[in-house]
């Protein structure tokens, strides 16, 4: 039954994904192919450069441009660009994958999907290098050439020889294709950063074009250098294999072998290979840039569908369903934009249903925003729990964060003073927040995100407590003083050592048994092995966790939380004058409670020893690294959202029922002391 229900959901997800992104994908591919003739023309002109005869140089270049063989290779290059664009579509991600250790980075690179990506790009790079070598003409055009020397008996040689220059071109293209794929995942180039300021697509492309060409020229130079070093040591292997397989001779009388220093110092060869690399990287980066521009363009989701058939694409339905992650991001981006710039659409959010008079639109939108923000609070609490226990969270038992209550119990109920959760969470983790379920194999994800299981598989390694924050347990660490927080493993061991009627009696009425001698012996041996391995430098080099990567992983999906903050706060501020039915007033206490609790969790996070308080300076580069500073943008957006509400409502917020801690914190915002 579950499978039958999930199939229609998957079908609806594919339908909405195609309706929203289908034309964008097609348009980006078409423009990538249309940009190819410009790149090909520039490549032909620079490959035949002759500064002493400029008129002859330009006339020959344009005459070759219209020749039949160039048109054929142009069609072949178009197929390559389409394949590269398809891989851009298949491997994109709205949440960057951040490995927390060098071993995790290696595992990310050798993943089967990544290996397939690298193999295809190496093959496409070889095809593009072959086309570039043939278009260049001259001594680089053919792999097999007639030998010019004589045989050992003194008669003219009739054999065919291997053209090592052409082989060098092909191998360089394969190397550049593989390097592009490797850097594609190492630098998170599949990550789609959404622009902060909405601009026209042409302006975004024009702004990136000069940086793209500069990046391609520099990267091609470094890749040619790396390949020359590699070919110097290992170039004889492919040369000997191809000459043996094709029964070709190697003519060393005309051209020096390229696996020597003198052979590699051929400036003409290096120039044409570098130019081929620039051509390859530029065309691939253009398709990549165009897909990013089209995929991250704002999309308008109707708040109220004009027809019943279009209800699946309305904003409240998309936010509360389980759409593909990019659709979720586009919906939250649209919520942020409508809350600021569209009074008519805000009225649709505040409207009541007919008949019935229920604020379904506001209820659905605010519920999802509060769930996202509560999920971020839970994630920060989990991270602080791991940091407080020196990165040690028990792997014997799954740790499950407290599930968010239903909206009827939390988000849409005016909190009583006796029922308000304490905003200051020292101890930041309460015993009811994490529960050890020994018989449940599944662990509830701490993300609190609306993404499906397939997306979570793609996000594997982004936030894994045992992966990112684990550290070898040593007796010195275990014997440290009293800790600020309580982990599930400590609670479990306390229950073993100090049994009480509430903990020693199971649900079936049976007494829990003490740990056996075998179990204690296994645990002791495991600790000894960990201590032994932690003293080995090479092992710790691969297994040690990078604190900055762990911090970035916590806020890797913070962009949608930023949009939820901005959208919710702008709607609440606008409701002061635009909400005719008072639908926002019923949820205002819950919204303030969520924001203030999250604010306290963020403040406690930034007070951790390894959490930097200032964003690093990011230089302008083609590869986007804005995800590294999302935590600072999230902190600023959260504080701005609270100030936006307090400055709008002013002293009216004193009538909102809240706990004493929240009232004190709210007063600081009202007095601009926060």
From Swiss-Prot:
Q: Pfam families in the record, alphabetically?
A: Ndc1_Nup
Q: Where is this region: Disordered?
A: 394-425
Q: Where are the transmembrane segments?
A: 25-45, 69-89, 115-135, 166-186, 226-246, 273-293
Q: Which residues carry this modification: Phosphoserine?
A: 406, 439, 445, 471, 474
Cellular compartments annotated: Nucleus, Nuclear pore complex; Nucleus membrane
Q: Might you report a single GO cellular component term?
A: actin cytoskeleton
The gene behind this protein is: NDC1
Q: Residue ranges, Perinuclear space compartment?
A: 46-68, 136-165, 247-272
High-level lineage: Eukaryota, Metazoa, Chordata, Craniata, Vertebrata
Q: Where is the composition biased (Polar residues)?
A: 407-421
Keywords from UniProt, A to Z, are: Membrane, mRNA transport, Nuclear pore complex, Nucleus, Phosphoprotein, Protein transport, Translocation, Transmembrane, Transmembrane helix, Transport
The miscellaneous comment for this protein is: Depletion of NDC1 from HeLa cells interferes with the assembly of phenylalanine-glycine (FG) repeat Nups into nuclear pore complexes.
The protein depicted here goes by the name Nucleoporin NDC1
